């Protein structure tokens, strides 16, 4: 851990500065700035706490060794403290491993139906509900930005904004960033009269939505803005005016829709926020080979062959093919009980980061 000393010193100094800023009433006059400082403070607090425990244990070990030199009964305490220091040292190494800079961010999540027609659209709706239920379990805020429904009430596509309310170091992105990819379902469709199991798929795309996206330069001449009549639920009159907005970024082909705000101006403003977040994510992807490799796991086309996860209804089984995770509680997972799976994905990611340091 000697090589980490400079990093620790820098973090301790930053921690002290953040403490002072959080105690300053003027900071809290700017809610955005206060949230940013609070999130960074929450991110480094576990590092500082673990480091202080490690230093205290080292001091205790030195004292125990001196006592053990005169009294053999202290030998057990020396062994116990040695083990404790080893655990704390490994924990600190883990905490100092490179973190995803977006872990504290909120997200935009898109669900798209793929091959399978109505069954795929119904499954896409099941996935959207799963993420909504998961967000509710964590006290997060979910906003439906736009959706296109199928004849049977499924989703051809749906776009959700999911935001946390606190300053946790691990925000929505930290938990749901692994969800991007093709999700495959095996079940008897409601349209199947012979009781045969069919396979279809839906795709999920996840993008971080940072607090600050001002650095993204968007040229108005690169945009095509279409307005149309909202098809979703909204305020009074939403179905009688062309309030929904679709923005196409011509250079990249990115399309963003928003239809659930009360006015066309509000829908356009929200769509521009989502577009800025997507363009920022795209720029970061292009700038980083590692990020590009990670993003490659997210779908470009919804093809049943490039799956990350399978939902098998006859066996009540869910299988994540990236980490060989299997569980027979599909009904609970679809009701938002995702934490065991997401914990396993996060642990695999953490191990990979440690191996690359």
Swiss-Prot record:
Keywords of this entry: Cytoplasm, Methylation, Protein biosynthesis
Ranges in a coiled coil: none
Gene3D superfamilies linked: 3.30.160.20, 3.30.70.1660, 6.10.140.1950
A Pfam match: PCRF
GO MF entries: translation release factor activity, codon specific
Cellular localization per UniProt: Cytoplasm
Positions of modified residues (N5-methylglutamine): 236
GO cellular component terms, semicolon-separated: cytoplasm
Post-translational modification: Methylated by PrmC. Methylation increases the termination efficiency of RF1.
Main subcellular location: cytoplasm
Record function comment: Peptide chain release factor 1 directs the termination of translation in response to the peptide chain termination codons UAG and UAA.
Family: Belongs to the prokaryotic/mitochondrial release factor family.
Protein name: Peptide chain release factor 1
Lineage: Bacteria, Bacillati, Actinomycetota, Actinomycetes, Mycobacteriales
């Amino acid at each position: 851990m000697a090589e980490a000393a400079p990093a620790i010193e820098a973090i301790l100094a930053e921690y002290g500065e953040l403490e002072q800023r959080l105690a300053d009433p003027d900071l809290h006059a700017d809610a955005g700035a206060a949230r940013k400082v609070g999130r960074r403070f929450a991110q480094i607090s576990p590092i500082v706490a673990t480091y202080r425990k490690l230093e205290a244990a080292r001091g205790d070990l030195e004292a125990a060794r001196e006592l053990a030199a005169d009294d053999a009964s202290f030998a057990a305490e020396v062994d116990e403290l040695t083990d404790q220091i080893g655990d704390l040292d490994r924990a600190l190494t883990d905490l100092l491993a490179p973190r995803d800079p977006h872990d504290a961010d909120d997200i935009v999540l898109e669900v798209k139906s793929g091959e399978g027609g109505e069954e795929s659209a119904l499954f896409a709706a099941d996935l959207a509900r799963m993420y909504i239920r998961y967000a509710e379990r964590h006290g997060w805020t979910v906003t439906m930005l736009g959706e296109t429904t199928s004849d049977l009430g499924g989703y051809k596509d749906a776009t959700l904004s999911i935001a946390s309310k606190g300053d946790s170091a691990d925000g929505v992105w930290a938990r749901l960033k692994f969800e991007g990819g093709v999700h495959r379902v095996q079940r008897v469709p409601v349209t199947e009269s012979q009781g045969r199991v069919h396979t279809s798929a839906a795709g999920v795309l996840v993008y971080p939505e940072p607090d600050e996206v001002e650095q993204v330069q968007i040229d108005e001449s690169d945009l095509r803005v279409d307005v149309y009549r909202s098809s979703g639920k909204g305020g009074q009159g939403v179905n009688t005016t062309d309030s929904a907005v679709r923005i196409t970024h011509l250079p990249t082909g990115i399309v963003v829709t928003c239809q659930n705000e009360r006015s066309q101006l509000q829908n356009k403003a929200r769509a521009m926020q989502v577009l800025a977040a997507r363009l920022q994510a795209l720029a970061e992807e292009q700038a980083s080979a590692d990020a590009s490799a990670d993003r490659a796991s997210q779908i470009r086309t919804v093809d049943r062959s490039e799956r990350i996860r399978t939902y098998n209804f006859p066996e009540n089984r869910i299988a994540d093919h990236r980490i060989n995770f299997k569980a027979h509680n599909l009904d609970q997972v679809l009701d938002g009980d995702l934490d065991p799976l997401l914990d396993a994905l996060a642990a695999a990611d953490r191990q990979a980061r440690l191996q690359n340091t």
